Amino acid sequence: IFRDLLEAMEGRDLIAACNVMAEDPPSGPHRFEYGPGVECILIPTMTLPPSTHTNCFVLGERGGQRAIVDPAIRDEDGYKLLKDKVEEIRGDGSDIVCTIFTHRHQDHLGDMDMISQIYQAPVWASEETLAALPEIQETRKLREGDEISIDGPSGRVDWEVLETPGHCPGQICLVGEPGVVAADNCTMVGTILVPSSDGDMGAYISGLERLRDLRPHTLFAGHGPLIPNPERMLTQYIEHRKARHAKVLQAVKSGCSNLSDIAISAYSDSPGANPALAQDQALSHLNELVRTGDVRKTGERFHSENPPHQVDGSSEGSNGLV
């Protein structure tokens, strides 16, 4: 509505512009503009509650080149949303130059057969993500430091690839002047899991630190609203994960050896935490502790050679996060 008001104010004062809009109100599809040249489509997906949608981003200006990030459609509702947006993009005289996937999880990776019925464009993603897709004729393997340039009426906007593989192998972010397309690193809705199956807790924390060091003014998260001035939130995420890491280590040092007991001890400050998720996240921390040599694993049990002692940060609350 703000953009419509600015257009109505050309050659008019504010009152006259409001009168023009009252006589001829804006019509047509609503555009969720998260930033300059960054539109969002809310795609319904089977993601982790409380989230119900995945953010599909359309990069670029109207009338210029466009890139579609994470078109995660897998049902008729998502198909219609993407189809309507693509028709709108074409009506603006824009060309879709590529499809970008941030990572291979199913709530971000769309059904390529459905997508190809709507539009055709090269697929750009990391090696790990491309390997999870069916054979596609035209692809580009994205790596750390690669640049994606999108031309528009106002000029060219460059996005740089940043690898943040902790949540998922091959996950990437896109860093540009409008902000950072941050994939599944943090969110204002719920929390981010680091799956014990293929996640990497050490890499996840390092990725958060890299994002914070960029001091971005906006994060475009994979789920939920945009995150303005995200440095504080990223710091909270980092401190929370490090505190939880310390609590898992302390649980092992205190004599807990099986996963269930370790999770109960490490999440004693979060009695409402889902037991299965708490165990999975505890295992992700344990995998990292085994990798760094702080914990050894024998069969299904975990041990530490060091005597029990208080670990810095082990008493810090979780605020309900995992």
Can you say where each PLM-predicted feature lies in the sequence?
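Residue-level signal for inorganic ion chemistry
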Residues: L59, L82, H223, V248, ...
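Aromatic/hydrophobic pocket-lining residues that form the small-molecule binding cavity
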Residues: L82, Y204, L208, A282
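Active-site HxH/HxHxD metal-binding segment of metal-dependent hydrolases
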Residues: T52, I73-D158
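Histidine-centered divalent metal-coordination motifs
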Residues: C98-H108, H167, Q171, H223, ...
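Metallo-beta-lactamase
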Residues: R66-I68, I73-E76, E147, S154-K247
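C-terminal regulatory/interaction regions
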Residues: R3-D4, A8-V20, P25, Q250-V322
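Conserved beta-strand hairpin/beta-sheet module of binuclear metal-dependent hydrolase folds
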Residues: P29-I89, C173-N185
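Glycine/proline-rich low-complexity segments that form flexible loops, beta-turns, and polyproline
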Residues: E10-E23, G37, A132-E138, D146, ...
